Amino acid sequence: MTNRLTLSGTVCRAPLRKVSPSGIPHCQFVLEHRSVQEEAGFHRQAWCQMPVIVSGHENQAITHSITVGSRITVQGFISCHKAKNGLSKMVLHAEQIELIDSGD
């Protein structure tokens, strides 16, 4: 089964870093996406806020460059996580992160 997602946007919630009891580093943040997409010949506004988690040592270095307002592209897979309130939420598990040059 295929499960791949590429999403570009702006980091809208500060990264939160934790280390699991087994020593695996995790970085969590929220990515906000806004764009205009074409569907059935019409333009529509697309918007979402997607929680992102970066796990393992491989991608942790780039997470130290990520702050609120950073523009990035994230590639990975999606999965549901059960929140503390018991509700499920979709989470993007990042496997590749690219900083988008702001052109400044």
Curated annotation (Swiss-Prot):
Listed Pfam families: SSB_1 (PF22657)
PROSITE patterns given in the database record: SSB
Top-level taxon of origin: Bacteria
GO cellular component: a single term: primosome complex
InterPro entries noted in UniProt: NA-bd_OB-fold, Primosome_PriB/ssb, Prisomal_replication_PriB
GO biological process, one term: DNA replication, synthesis of primer
Coiled coil start-end: none
UniProt protein name: Replication restart protein PriB
Organism: Salmonella typhi
Gene of this entry: priB
